[in-house]
Amino acid sequence: VVEQRAAYALVFGNDIGDLREILRAAALLKSSDRGIRDVVSGYGELWSAQLLCAQLAAQIGPQRVRWPDARTVMVVEEHELGPVVTWAASEQALQQHLVEDPADVVVITGYIASDRNGVQTTLGRNGSDYSASIFGALLEATEITIWTDVDGVMSADPRRVPDAAVIHSLSYNEAMELAYFGAKVIHPQTMAPAIAKQVPIVIRNTFDPAQPGSRIAAVAEPDGQVKGITSIDGIALINLEGAGMIGVPGTADRLFHALHEAGISVVLISQASSEHSICVEVPEAAADRAHAVVGRAFDVELRDGQIQNVEVTRSASFLAVVGDGMAGTPGVAAKVFGALGESSVNIRAIA
């Protein structure tokens, strides 16, 4: 134990020295590029993984525990939507490490990786959970457990719905929908590697490990029609309407291209069956930019009267009702709309 403590202290001390030099260089240059930020932000994961490895080694023996540095086994490439794993190279590197240095318990660093040139990078927001899913997929694990500060995926936001309960079983589709539309427990990107290999994900509470948590798998246990309700506030509706749109191909393509070029994310799309209007929901912070770029994209049609208006409705909220059991079940929409109507909530768009 004394030797392990001394070894960790030496590594920690050397890293602190390197960190000082990196920060001193950034201060002198008065700038820090992406590479510097990746290196600095990765130290926490390196230290915590090595510390856990040392603690486990002290308990069960150093020969049974290994710490592979994720920078040597996970290879990623930067794409427009974020880092993408180079699966073949990562799998080969990981298997080689496990063969050359086998152990009963492997503690792998989360959040950090390397590009094809061996330069350190990070997986960005929710990178640690994403790492767990990636390694679970690479190892074809029987299960991936994500430890958080809540009991699992909730049926609604408990701050708004006091009797919200933990959803003990969800399908991948249900979890993806809830995550995309506001549930903060797990990021949609985190689930992608696990889904590809059909590895179940379990969400557990670090502070209450006795709780069973939420299990996310290809098929969920039957548990009613609606699994959860979630929402996003701070939404703006951009409505493009005009008789000149009817039967004209390419209108939607031009609309989405204009928003894409401006870097504006679309939350929801709704189009009238008559093709007289298209409504999209965007973050309210981007409402002015969205209004401007859509106006420029259809400037000719607006001046000619083919399109009557580009209307912006602010301070809207998006409400999603999620559940695989709703498919083919009559009356669900009627209950939702009835409840909203009783509460005097106006519905502006449906998808």
Go through the PLM ranges and name each one.
Residues 143-147, 201-203, 267-268, 349:
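Short hydrophobic alpha-helical runs that function as membrane-insertion/retention elements
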Residues 64-66, 200, 346:
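Conserved beta-strand segments of alpha/beta enzyme cores
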Residues 213-351:
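A conserved regulatory-domain signal marking ACT and ACT-like small-molecule sensing domains
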Residues 5, 24, 199-202, 295, ...:
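Non-catalytic alpha-helical coupling and interface elements of nucleotide-dependent molecular machines
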Residues 1-191, 281:
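Nucleotide/pyrophosphate-binding catalytic subdomain
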Residues 197-211, 233-234:
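Active-site C-terminal subdomain of aminotransferase-like
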Residues 59-60, 197, 262, 343:
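Conserved dinucleotide-binding and phosphotransfer motif residues
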